[in-house]
């Protein structure tokens, strides 16, 4: 099954630095009015996962969620998270450093989409016990075009 989520080396390095500085992190891609479809990074203690939020994957022990309506839009796209300069006006914690996370997408091939459909829908809502289990299977590095280590594709039980 193809991963739904990939972090570039730059995004992974920034995530690790932010996690060292701020503690456990969570990502959320909401598609809301203020930030559009920019991935937002928060301290886990500062963000409440909604019951319909979809867990796309774990990267370096950080869960990455997308809002339910956004997932409907991105369901057949692989998302690559990267970093660019220009923090701007953002609630995401990396903005203070003058950078921001961005997302790029590509459509899954018909074969990849079929594999995702066969695996069932991703998990939804806050998942503290399942997230711990997911972390045990995750490794530490990821980049586009590589073997996608570091991101655990999520699926239902």
Regions found by a protein language model. Name each.
Residues 1-157:
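Domain-level signature for proteins that mediate thiol-based redox and metal-cofactor handling
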């Amino acid at each position: 099954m193809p991963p739904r989520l990939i972090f570039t080396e730059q995004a992974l390095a920034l995530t690790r630095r932010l996690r060292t500085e701020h503690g456990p992190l969570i990502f959320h891609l909401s598609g809301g009015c203020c930030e559009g479809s920019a991935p937002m990074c928060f301290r886990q203690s500062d963000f409440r996962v909604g019951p319909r939020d979809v867990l796309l994957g774990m990267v370096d022990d950080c869960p990455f969620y997308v809002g339910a309506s956004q997932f409907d839009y991105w369901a057949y796209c692989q998302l690559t998270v990267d970093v660019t300069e220009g923090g701007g006006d953002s609630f995401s914690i990396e903005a203070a450093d003058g950078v921001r996370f961005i997302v790029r997408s590509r459509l899954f091939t018909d074969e990849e989409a079929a594999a995702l459909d066969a695996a069932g829908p991703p998990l939804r809502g806050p998942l503290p016990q399942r997230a711990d289990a997911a972390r045990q299977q995750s490794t530490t590095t990821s980049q586009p075009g590589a073997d996608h280590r570091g991101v655990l594709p999520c699926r239902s039980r």
